[in-house]
Amino acid sequence: MHFRIRKCPNCGRYTLKEVCPVCGSETKVAHPPRFSPEDPYGEYRRRLKRELLGIGRRS
């Protein structure tokens, strides 16, 4: 499935274009990524996030 609607991170406008027609900045996909309970890369993504934020693992 290909999502078409996009959102400008600067002015908050929604558009179908890759560049915001109002402020000219690059738009981002407005939809969150799909969730899967069997996420094969979830452990690695969480580990990287903890390392980048300097958060220790709770015991």
UniProtKB/Swiss-Prot annotation:
GO cellular component, one term: ribonucleoprotein complex
Entry GO MF terms: snoRNA binding
InterPro entries named in the record: H/ACA_rnp_Nop10 (IPR007264), H/ACA_rnp_Nop10_sf (IPR036756), Nop10_arc-typ (IPR023532)
Keywords in alphabetical order: Ribonucleoprotein, Ribosome biogenesis, rRNA processing
UniProt record, GO biological process: pseudouridine synthesis; rRNA processing
Family classification: Belongs to the NOP10 family.
NCBIfam families per record: PRK13130.1 (NF009623)
Function: Involved in ribosome biogenesis; more specifically in 18S rRNA pseudouridylation and in cleavage of pre-rRNA.
Protein name: Ribosome biogenesis protein Nop10
Organism: Thermococcus kodakarensis (strain ATCC BAA-918 / JCM 12380 / KOD1) (Pyrococcus kodakaraensis (strain KOD1))
Higher taxonomy: Archaea, Methanobacteriati, Methanobacteriota, Thermococci, Thermococcales
